[in-house]
Amino acid sequence: MKCFVITVDHPKSHEIADRCIESCAKQGLHVEKFNAITPKDNPREIITKITGNTKMNFDMEPFPERVAACFASQLTLWDRCSKDTEPYLILEHDAVLELPFPHDIEFDKCITLGRPSWGTFLDSPQTLSKKYSNGVNKLKTHCFIGNHAVLMKPEGAKEIIELAGHKLIEPADTFLCQFYFNFLEEYFPWPFVVRETFSMIQGDAKGDGKANTLHIKNNIDLWTYEVIDPDENIHNND
């Protein structure tokens, strides 16, 4: 298994990516940083180059090009996994490993190990214990509720890449949905959780038809939460 944490070339991203790496190292996982794609890299061109698809649905997001860049970062690793011979654990920089990692996990093709990071999917512990069995479960929600900790096999990555070639492309977590893929699973209790104080992708809407994306996040303090431009204060940025 190869492990990557998607990291923007920005001091705050490096800081929390290091936290992610350290949390994983405590349980014997070696995680490498993967340089995130940002809007300045023309993410839509990267998506089209990999998939051949030009149909994308990002424009309702507060920052469409940031969401496209997030998808392009994930997609690049999916593409790399599809050509490899072992599973990839793909982490986002604000993921933290807080529960035991299932080193001997047996799963189908693609599974989330991350606690839902948005929406109303976190019930009481008593309800969750009735809803889930310990270990691998069929995905209980319509899509991955955050792509902060996804484990996939090359064969799963291949199917995802192939479908991305002819389906409408949307934000990375909602793209990994049961409508498209019947093999999606989730591990319970979720080993990874998002610990975030800022976002380089999401924000509140400023225009008609745009989505408010901060208010549906879990475990954040909206009074102190920051929205940061991923192309601001980047090292060696021309």
Q: Predicted segment positions?
A:
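An acidic/histidine-cluster motif and surrounding catalytic segment
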Residues: 1-91, 95-238
